[in-house]
């Protein structure tokens, strides 16, 4: 759905600036310069729809007030003035029409207007009518969804109607450091002390109900907070059971999430629970870039002038949203159309059923925006592009299909055959009944071809870029160990009941737990010596979280003629990783093995100076105790894990896989050197190493094997080590330190996102 309207402002802008504004409206609305209600929507439906909205004052309020500023008077860039990004603006209009659509996620690098579009959408949202005294923006027309206790507090006017008032549609942003109690709500200490009972204090979720809930950099949001947030949004209700509170309130805002994939991917599980996932990293023409810079400069110099230039487009979008919300109640989608969406999802390799559910809702919203009660072909195609395509697993089209010639045109028909065919068609049309006509109309509302072919490839190659963008930013499922929880160090994320002595007292949670009992405790204390009464049962401890770095342990074969090259490569790779690990808190350790045993040449460290000093001496030569080297790496990793500073551990083994020293000889050289001590066979040495590799997998560590064996005498045992440890394997016999560093960084990045 494009936005091709060229809008000539009715006010004069800077003489040197010629701007072309792209309308927010779909093509059926953009056939004329401005939205014409009576020409686009059926007249018999327009008047009652407007009247239905104006009864609560929303339409009148929208025309009288300008809602382009935040609560603090800050002017946000208008959405109608954003150049390009048509698909994202369409998605935002869909979300404004139906906040229950499932949320919108926008990915993009820096400077792609992600946040600008999210904030600019707030200006086109119509105001809402809420019940007076409601803490969660209760809808007077849906009393079954009111929060607990509102029935007792509600007030009535002289006519017996519930008292209401009009407010701006809420726009709530969740900060990255938000705590759980601020998000879902907690105890109101002041009111609890006054009343002597537990009083609920609403959180951000209550404030965002029926509005917009915006999360910037959702990929950096705490994992527990993001899971809690999406669970509440999926259920549509926030149930708080904590600190003596039992409270529930509705929570159905429109979720808008933005993130930069370069700063970390979003878990696939989270993206799957958001309906529309789009990328702002789309190619932009030179002319559009010039226009974007021009309008941004004009907004900085004179924002009021820009608002005036797009004022009419913004008002039209508000009216369109109000009307579309009413049409949405009557929009229907047929069973055949649902089958089409399911087939597209199956061909695209989409997992689960969320894609079809979201796509059906998006198609209905598109029809409502067009002022229709039925879903058409274009609605289905657009729904597939917005919802199913970003979730798809694209397969490459076979070469023989890519260069296939187009099918030959049908043979020409003579005039007599045409006349006979026309007569037969007329007879068939007369014999068709009403049911046949409905079936024919239904068939016309299905696309003639699928977006995905039977093999899962894209029929339209123009859509390949969008699918690739979606797959590039897609994260992996799983629970990350990039955060360490403790009770003594880190950032305070939530209170908890102490398990033993309290190391860090959560003063806020302790006061909240004690607040409801202050009145009773004062009455018991006749001497009245204290102002606040806190008992041991009120104590709450802080749960802290801190960023956990990864530990990379280089296990280097320092035996043989190529030992010096391996050690130099490991040294260079370690120094490169340390130079880049300041923000990620990664540590590096080097364990060379030679002679009869392995030694920790560089203990886990983030210091480049220490690494340079320790690595000045590079011991080489002797036997190859590979099993002892891997065992030492496991011991170092476990000790580092106990320190509480390491979340992920990766062992990088640079070896040819040839071992000639047993683990018994490495642990007890004197006993192994005795004349009567049996010498281990080659198979026994391999079994030892395989056993250690299995232990690496069981401890949760990751193994990367860089095979340096000559391919002419290769035994393939290094690859077997990686297979048993469920690790990665690279054959790099002549790799430099840069190549080793690159391979390690890629494996480490995959480990952190897993």
Swiss-Prot record:
It catalyses: protoporphyrin IX + Mg(2+) + ATP + H2O = Mg-protoporphyrin IX + ADP + phosphate + 3 H(+). Residues 417-443 have a biased composition (Acidic residues). Its main location: plastid. Residues 404-413 have a biased composition (Pro residues). CDD domains: vWA_Magnesium_chelatase. Disulfide bonds: none annotated. The keyword Plastid applies. Residues 395-443 are annotated as: Disordered. One of its GO terms (molecular function) is magnesium chelatase activity. Gene3D superfamilies: Magnesium chelatase subunit I, C-Terminal domain (1.10.8.80), P-loop containing nucleotide triphosphate hydrolases (3.40.50.300), von Willebrand factor, type A domain (3.40.50.410). It holds the Pfam family AAA_lid_2. One of its GO terms (cellular component) is chloroplast. GO terms for biological process: chlorophyll biosynthetic process; photosynthesis. SMART domains: AAA, VWA. Keywords: ATP-binding, Chlorophyll biosynthesis, Chloroplast, Ligase, Nucleotide-binding, Photosynthesis, Plastid, Transit peptide. It is found in: Plastid, Chloroplast. Belongs to the Mg-chelatase subunits D/I family. This is Magnesium-chelatase subunit ChlD, chloroplastic.
């Amino acid at each position: 759905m494009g936005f091709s309207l060229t809008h000539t402002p009715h006010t004069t802008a800077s003489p040197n600036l010629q701007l072309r504004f792209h309308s927010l409206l779909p093509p059926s609305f953009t056939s004329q310069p401005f939205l014409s209600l009576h020409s686009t929507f059926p007249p018999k439906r327009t008047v009652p729809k407007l009247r239905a909205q104006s009864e609560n004052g929303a339409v009148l309020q929208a025309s009288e007030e300008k809602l382009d500023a935040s609560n603090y008077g800050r002017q946000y860039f208008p959405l109608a003035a954003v150049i390009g990004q048509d698909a994202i603006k369409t998605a935002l209009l869909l979300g404004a029409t139906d906040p229950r659509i499932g949320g919108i996620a926008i990915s993009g690098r820096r400077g792609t207007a992600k946040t600008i579009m999210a904030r600019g959408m707030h200006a086109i949202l119509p105001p809402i009518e809420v019940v007076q005294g409601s803490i969660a923006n209760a809808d007077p027309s849906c009393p079954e969804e009111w929060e607990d206790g509102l029935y007792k507090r509600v007030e009535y006017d002289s006519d017996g109607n519930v008292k209401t008032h009009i407010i701006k549609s809420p726009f709530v942003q969740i900060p990255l450091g938000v705590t759980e109690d601020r998000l879902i709500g907690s105890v109101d200490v002041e009111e609890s002390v006054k009343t002597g009972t537990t009083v609920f204090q609403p959180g951000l979720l209550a404030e965002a109900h029926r509005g917009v809930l915006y999360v910037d950099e959702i990929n950096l949001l705490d994992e527990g907070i993001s899971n809690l947030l999406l669970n509440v949004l999926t259920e549509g209700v926030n149930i708080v059971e904590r600190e003596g509170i039992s409270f529930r309130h509705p929570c159905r805002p429109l979720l808008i999430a933005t993130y930069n994939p370069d700063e970390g991917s979003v878990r696939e599980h989270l993206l799957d629970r958001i309906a529309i996932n789009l990328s702002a990293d789309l190619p932009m023409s030179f002319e559009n870039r010039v226009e974007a810079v021009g309008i941004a400069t004009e907004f900085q110099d004179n924002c009021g002038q820009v608002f005036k230039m797009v004022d009419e487009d913004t008002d039209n979008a508000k009216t369109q949203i109000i009307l579309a919300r009413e049409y949405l109640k009557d929009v229907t989608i047929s069973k055949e159309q649902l089958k089409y969406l399911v087939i597209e999802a199956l061909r695209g390799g989409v997992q689960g059923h969320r894609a079809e559910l979201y796509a059906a809702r998006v198609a209905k919203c598109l029809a409502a925006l067009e002022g229709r009660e039925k879903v058409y072909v274009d609605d289905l195609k657009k729904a597939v592009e917005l919802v199913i395509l970003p979730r798809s697993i694209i397969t490459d089209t076979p070469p023989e299909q890519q260069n296939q010639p187009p099918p030959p045109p049908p043979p020409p028909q003579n005039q007599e055959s045409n006349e006979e065919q026309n007569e037969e068609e007329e007879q068939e049309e007369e014999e068709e009944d009403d049911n046949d006509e409905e079936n024919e109309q239904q068939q016309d509302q299905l696309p003639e071809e699928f977006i995905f072919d039977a093999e899962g490839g894209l029929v339209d190659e123009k859509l390949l870029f969008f699918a690739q963008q979606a797959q590039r930013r897609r994260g992996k499922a799983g629970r990350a160990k990039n955060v360490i929880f403790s009770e003594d160090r880190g950032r305070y994320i939530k209170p908890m009941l102490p398990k033993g002595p309290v190391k860090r007292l959560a003063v806020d949670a302790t006061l909240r737990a004690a607040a409801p009992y202050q009145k009773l405790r004062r009455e018991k204390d006749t001497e009245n010596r204290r102002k606040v009464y806190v008992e041991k049962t009120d104590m709450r401890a802080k749960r802290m979280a801190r960023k956990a770095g990864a530990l990379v342990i280089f296990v280097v074969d320092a035996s043989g003629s190529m030992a010096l090259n391996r050690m130099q490569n490991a040294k260079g790779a370690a120094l490169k990783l340390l130079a880049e690990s300041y923000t990620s808190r990664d540590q590096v350790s080097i364990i060379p093995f030679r002679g009869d045993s392995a030694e920790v040449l560089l203990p886990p460290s983030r210091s480049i100076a220490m690494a340079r000093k320790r690595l000045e001496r590079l011991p080489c030569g002797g036997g190859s105790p590979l099993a002892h080297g891997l065992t030492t790496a496991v011991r170092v990793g476990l000790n580092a894990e106990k320190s509480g500073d390491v979340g992920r551990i990766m062992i990088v083994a640079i070896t040819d896989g040839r071992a000639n020293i047993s683990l018994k000889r490495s642990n007890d050289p004197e006993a192994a050197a005795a004349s009567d001590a049996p010498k281990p066979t080659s198979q026994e040495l391999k079994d030892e190493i395989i056993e250690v590799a299995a232990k690496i997998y069981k401890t949760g560590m990751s193994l990367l094997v860089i095979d340096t064996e000559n391919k002419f005498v290769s035994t393939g045992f290094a690859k077997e080590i990686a297979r048993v440890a469920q690790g990665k394997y690279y054959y790099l016999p002549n790799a430099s330190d840069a190549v080793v560093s690159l391979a390690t960084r890629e494996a480490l990045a995959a480990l952190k996102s897993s």
